[in-house]
Every structure is written in structure tokens, then in C-alpha cells.
Amino acid sequence: MRVSDFNFDLPDELIARYPKTDRVSCRLLQLNGENGEIFHRTFSDVLDLIDEGDLLIFNNTRVIPARMFGRKASGGKIEVLVERMLDEHRFLAHIRSSKSPKEGAELFLGEDKLGENNGIKAVMKARHSSLFEVELSDKSTALLDVLQTIGHMPLPPYIDRPDEEADKECYQTVYSKVPGAVAAPTAGLHFDENLLEKLKAKGVNFEFVTLHVGAGTFQPVRVENIEDHVMHAEYVEVSQEVCNAIIATKKAGKRVIAVGTTSVRSIESAALSAEEFGNPDLIEPYFSDTSIFIYPGKKFRVVDCLITNFHLPESTLIMLVSAFAGYKNTMNAYKHAVQEKYRFFSYGDAMFINKNSNVRGLE
């Protein structure tokens, strides 16, 4: 399979640069993965699509204000995007500057907010491929506190505008809990507290995994054949409680519904681990990095339904959706979404998909 197989034409005006003020009012394209049928709905209709006893799996990661602006000691401007927090004072980051900082170079962060010559001092300790290991010089202040003071919400590049005060709330799920993501698990942005309460009242069960979404989620696939692509790693936590709930749901004949591709990758990583290590259970606890890459031809061991946004052309995320719903069904649904002027990407509209259990490759 070629990357170009997953391309589609998207008018620029369909890229959502601001969210809906009412989270549940976005549009919802329902796709039957078994036969390709499409229904046009509103997101609040998920209440009618999810049954009593079904299990919703959410990703409770919380987006950190991971983008910082500053300068090198030489005076050159830098933009720092935290990729992963290593401890309270060290982090891995992408750094944009005219010249990459060398090991031992001093950085002064946050001068856009703190004023010239008042930046927070940090040191570039080492380079790991495309990432820079950076350490705060002042050990009396934790990294999260620094980010809350000087950081900007790391809006995706396609939103193409500076972050605003409202993004601190809008680019965050209402159930986010564990800080560490540099991109939101965007399918969850459509749920508000009222909808969650209605789902609970209906008898729908909830469980939470944690996958700290990295900036790699926006990186293009740079190979021609998708089988040659090396997936970026992200940290995942799937607890025993989550595993027990999934097993009980399956035994009861109910559905496991993943909210977002990150929830899919978390659950399927834990299920793949169980299979590879000969665990007789369907799934086992998982606390590790995952580089799982799901594309057409790969099987799904756990997930029955998927709630997801509309993704970038030629991205690993549209490949995952194609594996889940079938390639032809997915590309046809995207064609319909463009024709019907759905809003795309992080602040855009959503899909509700039930799995095609028979797909193989580009079918």
C-alpha cells in the first residue's frame, strides 16, 4: 500500500480553526463499517447510538502548555515544543532556531511573557536524534509550574493561528486528568458534562486509559510504502481495572467503544502484548511506550466501535480508520464529508464507526 492511496482533496475553508461553542453541537457522520452506509447526525445523537452495558474507553491525558518562546545566549530566537517530560526539571523537546543549540548551550525561555532579560534559564544537555534534552537551571521550580507560567497551548500547525486564552479550555477534554500530552485526544472534545451524565444514566460504562499524545502525531509519513513507516513512540497506561471491564463487557455480549484513535492504540497495544506473551486473557495491563501502527490488513482484537474526528490526508490516523471501517468505506465517507462541508481536524466534526470485521488491505 502506498501513502498516496490515502490522499484526498480538502478545501482550506473546511479546516476548523476554532471550535464550536457548544461541544455536542458539532456534526456527526455515522459510518457502518460492514456495508458502508452513511448517516448524517449531530454529536449529541451518540446517546442513541450507544447502548446500556456498552463500555466507553476515554483517554484522560491532559494537554500541557508545551510551546515556549525564548532565545539562546547568543541572542538568536528559539521556539521550544516539549515532547515529553522526563522528570520535574528535564524534558525532551523539538527546538526551532536558525542554528540548533549545542550541548551545554544556555537557553532563556518565556521572554515573550516575562519580558526581555527575564527569561527562565535552561541548559541543552544532550541531543537524541531530532529531540533535544533540556534541563531547567533553577531546581526550586517544577517544569509544570514553569509551563503554566510561560507556556502556550500547542495548537496543531494546520490551525494556523496563535493560541488564545479560550484554547486553554477548548483544547482540553472535560475529563482530562493526567498532564503530559502536547496534542489533545480530539474525539473527546465533543463530550460535555451533561452528555456524560446522560450516558451514565442510560447504563453506559466508562473506563479511562492514558496515552500522552506527542507532536509526532502531526508528522507526515515520509516513505512511499506505508509498511516501511516507523511509528513514533508514545507512553501508555492501561490498568487492570480497564482490562477487567473490557473482559466483562465482551462476556456480556456488549460493545467496547473507543473514544479516539489514541484510545484504540492504547487498548490494542495491551491486547497485542497479551497475545505475544501467551496470556490467555484477551488483554493485560500495559504501562510502557507503544509504537503500534495500525493500517489496512491489521486486525483489531478488542475495539468494536470508534468515535473519531476527520484526519489529515496521508496520515497514520486515516490509515487506522481505514483499517477499522475498510479502505473503500473510509475514503467514500471522507468524500461525502467534503461534499457535505463537514469541518475537519482537531476542532472539527466527528465520526461514529462500527467495525468492518472482514476487511483485508485496500478493500
UniProtKB/Swiss-Prot annotation:
GO BP term (any one): tRNA wobble guanine modification
EC number of this enzyme: 2.4.99.17
UniProt pathway: tRNA modification; tRNA-queuosine biosynthesis
Role according to the record: Transfers and isomerizes the ribose moiety from AdoMet to the 7-aminomethyl group of 7-deazaguanine (preQ1-tRNA) to give epoxyqueuosine (oQ-tRNA).
PANTHER family according to UniProt: S-ADENOSYLMETHIONINE:TRNA RIBOSYLTRANSFERASE-ISOMERASE
Self-association state and partner proteins as the record states: Monomer.
Protein's UniProt name: S-adenosylmethionine:tRNA ribosyltransferase-isomerase
